[in-house]
Regions:
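Class I (Rossmann-like) S-adenosyl-L-methionine-dependent methyltransferase catalytic domain
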Residues: 1-43, 50-100, 117-121, 125, ...
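A conserved beta-strand element that flanks and buttresses the S-adenosyl-L-methionine
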Residues: 106-107
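Hydrophobic adenine-recognition pocket in adenosine-nucleotide-binding enzymes
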Residues: 110
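Helix-to-beta-strand junctions that scaffold the AdoMet/dcAdoMet cofactor pocket
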Residues: 114-116, 130-131
Length: 199
């Protein structure tokens, strides 16, 4: 699926993240773990922020100056209504130029929708966008080798890809970052949380 097709899928299912069916605790414990590695609150970017606002709310309570980015206009419209004081970017992370370096970047359940051929380049971009000592948390498919698949999600097609854990770890090292945490947090599902820090 192309980025435009991913945006169309999320436009169609955007209301799910505002419904009682969505677990607003999803990913929060993992973010709290990642935030322990941050020396002090500064600037933060939520990549693929979606509409729920739960990660943005957590970062605001920790006194971060937060920005959000999403490719779905409908998701972002809902996010803006929830947090009108936050700067949001309607953009494709594949082509978006980060306007500055950040002390914390979240890419929770988002960059695995990036086309496989571009995935490691996007990760390199995010790593380069970290301030010294900055921390990133992101999710990936827990595969050894590159894989991609399109499956139904809430009645819509949704693409996921993984460059493979070995390639991701090499990219972290090459990008001047240390892996601080790697966890198959929904085992036996292949959902992996990674936390890395710029050295």
């Amino acid at each position: 699926m192309t980025p435009d097709e991913i945006a169309a899928t999320y436009n169609a299912i955007a209301e799910h993240w505002d419904s009682s069916d969505f677990n607003r605790d999803n990913g929060i414990a993992q973010h709290e773990r990642a935030l322990r590695f941050v020396a002090k609150a500064g600037s933060a970017l939520d990549v693929g922020c979606g509409s729920s606002g739960r990660i943005i709310e957590l970062l605001l309570t920790r006194k971060f100056a937060v920005e959000g980015l999403d490719i779905s206009p409908e998701m972002l419209a809902r996010a803006r209504r929830r947090h009108p004081q936050v700067t949001f970017h309607l953009a494709d992370i594949c082509t978006f130029s980060l306007p500055k370096r950040y002390d914390f970047i979240s890419a929770w359940d988002s960059i695995w929708h990036v086309p496989l051929a571009q995935q490691l380049d996007v990760l390199r971009k995010l790593l380069a966008g970290l301030s010294p000592g900055g921390v990133i948390i992101f999710t990936a498919g827990g595969t050894q080798a590159p894989e991609q698949v399109t499956n139904p999600c809430l009645g819509q097609p949704l693409y996921h890809a993984s460059a493979g854990i070995p390639a991701i770890l090499r990219t972290l090292e090459e990008g001047g970052c240390a892996c601080r945490h790697l966890e198959y947090d929904q085992y036996p599902e292949r959902h992996v949380t990674l936390i890395a820090q710029r050295l």
